[in-house]
Design a protein with these regions (language model features):
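N-terminal secretory signal peptides
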Residues: 1-20, 31-38
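A structural signal for short loop-to-beta-strand junctions that line the ligand-binding cleft
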Residues: 59, 124-133, 148-190, 218
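Short helices/loops that flank or line small-molecule/ion binding pockets
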Residues: 113-127, 140-144, 209, 213, ...
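Flexible hinge/capping segments at coil-to-helix
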Residues: 197-214
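Ligand-binding pocket segment of bilobal, Venus flytrap-like solute-binding proteins
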Residues: 218-232, 236-284
Length: 284
């Protein structure tokens, strides 16, 4: 369990040291907001970042090349269980003629950022056009000059299909650099049949059920502390968009207790999906 404790400690320190205020971290778009950001190949901009980012060393070929390289999380696109095809993505390719390289290579925000950070800071290409990041990480990229402004004049759906409360967010006023994708919620996931066989119901409705002793060692929580801590604070009756340090530490103590007693099997990024598929984990 020490590995899980260490991960929680690292993520918590990163959370508390974030340049964003607590209110901005968990506001408006919801606990689990995720934004699709147009990667700018490290191009610097007037973003107020502490260190100026070198100018991009790669050429924008979007006018001449009908290709799109997209990095995202596992499970963020509708997929045919039998064939592995992605109907929505296939329809987009057919309609536009754009060749899409769709890569599920984001398991954790910090992990992915560490992989491409040096290239971004040096103004080099990361070989992606579109990256799906949680709101707080999208904010860091935008503020650091790593994102490219969107041309809304050729994106009518950017306004037509986005609800009003997500049209204008604190980290990206006017949505100049990002658009919401799978945004505005933090959820539980579980294996219905296995859950019912252990606790008598196939539905999870509260955190209390996750801590049922019959699920000991079969529960995973996300390494994305903004999701995990937000849900725990709400469970404890506190507002995850406006909380005190004492309330935050109360939630941390609850998490540590459940890790130390073995109730929580692991703290993971989106790699939890493999444990769900194998049956090692029943709920996340």
């Amino acid at each position: 369990m020490s590995e899980n404790r260490d991960l929680v400690a690292r993520e918590t320190v990163a959370f508390m040291r974030s340049a964003l205020s607590r209110r901005r971290i968990l506001q408006a778009a919801g606990i689990g907001g995720v934004a699709a950001v147009a990667a700018a190949c490290g191009a610097g901009g007037d973003t107020g970042s502490a260190t100026a980012t070198p100018a991009a060393t790669t050429q924008d070929l979007s006018d001449s090349e009908k290709t799109l390289s997209w990095s995202t999380w596992p499970g963020y696109m509708d997929t045919d269980d039998k064939t592995g095809a992605r109907p929505s993505l296939d329809a987009f390719v057919k309609q536009t003629g754009i060749d899409v390289t769709y890569t599920e290579d984001i398991n954790d925000n910090n992990e992915f950022y560490a992989k491409v950070r040096t290239q971004l800071e040096q103004g080099q290409s990361i070989d992606r056009d579109l990256v799906v990041l949680t709101d707080w990480m999208a904010a860091l990229w935008i503020e650091s000059g790593y994102a490219q402004k969107l041309d809304k004049s050729i994106m009518p759906n950017a306004s037509a299909n986005v609800i009003d409360k997500l049209q204008n967010v604190a980290f990206d006023p006017g949505r100049e650099y990002s658009l919401p994708w799978q945004s505005g919620f933090g959820l539980f996931g579980w294996n219905k049949s296995k859950l019912k066989s252990l606790i008598g119901t196939d539905t999870l409705t509260s955190v209390d059920q996750l801590f049922n002793p019959k699920l000991k060692g079969r529960v995973t929580v996300l390494s994305e502390m903004r999701d995990t801590m937000g849900i725990l604070m709400a469970w404890q009756g506190n507002d995850p968009s406006n909380f005190t340090e004492a309330q935050f530490m109360q939630a941390i103590d609850a998490l540590r207790t459940q890790i130390d007693n073995g109730q929580i099997r692991s703290v993971e990024g989106n790699s939890y999906m493999s444990d769900m598929e194998s049956g090692n984990v029943i709920a996340v």
